[in-house]
Amino acid sequence: MKEFIDPIARLINQFNKLPAVGGKTAQRYALKSLDMSEGEVEEFARVLLDTKKNVKYCSVCGNFTEAGADPCDICRKRDSSVICVVKDAKDVFALEKTGEYEGVYHILGGVLSPLDGIGPEQLRIKELLKRITPEVKEVIVATNPNAVSYTHLTLP
């Protein structure tokens, strides 16, 4: 006998696709959603779809922005003479929580990982270089250092 009937197994499979959601957590999410009212499930699905439709990437920094608001608020309202380079939007959220940084960001969209086929061409490095103009006074690299990126940066 199967552990779960097909509709529940498919739902577990979908939750399992989320980062940091393993099998047991996916099962808990799926079973909890079955305990929710139909209205709650519809609202959850509606918010998920609305977010997917209405959240885009800023054409300047690569951060999230609402559809129709491009460039994002940070790019429009902040000091563009200081650029903080980060791996992804989670890093922007973390830095914004401090309330201390007043410059703009540039999201690379990942890290160098030649073993995974991720080189400079797969990251937003060209876009970063285009942003570095004489008006830019400082570029802060706020990524986690690792042996691969150091090797790549030092070799011709």
Regions found by a protein language model. Name each.
Residues 151-156:
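Conserved small/polar residues in nucleotide/adenosyl-binding loops
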Residues 26, 76-143:
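Extended interfacial segments that mediate partner engagement and assembly in macromolecular machines
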Residues 143-150:
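Acidic, metal-coordinating catalytic cores used for nucleic-acid/nucleotide bond scission
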Residues 41, 117-118, 149:
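Alpha-helix N-cap/helix-start motif
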Residues 2-8, 13, 17, 25-83, ...:
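Cys/His-rich Zn2+-binding cysteine-cluster or related metal-binding knuckle/ribbon modules and their
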